[in-house]
Amino acid sequence: DKLCGVVKAMRMRILELGGEVRFGTRMTSVLHSNGHVTAVRYIDAQGEQELPAESVILAIGHSARDTFEALHSAGVPMEPKPFSMGVRIEHPQRQINENQYGPFADAPGLGAADYKLNVQLPSGGSAYTFCMCPGGYVVAAASEPGGVVTNGMSDHARDGENANAALLVTLNPADFPDSSPLGGMYW
């Protein structure tokens, strides 16, 4: 419930520093010459545009497969990287409070309890919890048609009935069926 204000403040700071923020805009390619960026090509409501640029920061986020494919096709150096994949687990917040606080589970001022689990596997990988959301919610977060993605969130008060966390395993490039730089993405 505070994220909107944080994002707005970040955007305002970028603008104060002379940056630009473009909504309703999709980058289609980064143009370069002699190994240096020269421009960014994009599409907006007016059609395809080109913006001269000497430097570009791509804050791509998740599920930007088209962007990674375009950069790979343009010859941008890439290598496969490890990442984690898993599921969202959800349980009653009361249960977590009792497990963590014991007889003090109802003590005023303690708030919703959290937890973290981690195990190193003999294979060298790991299984762990991440983004534990006390008193939170499991939310749909797919950004592509046909995609199934979940995430978790807690309101500032952390007073929801349930808790949730991501339960993840580490995947290394050797685990991918395709050894290309985009092998993990296609898997």
Identify the function of each model-found stretch.
Residues 1-187:
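Residues forming the flavin
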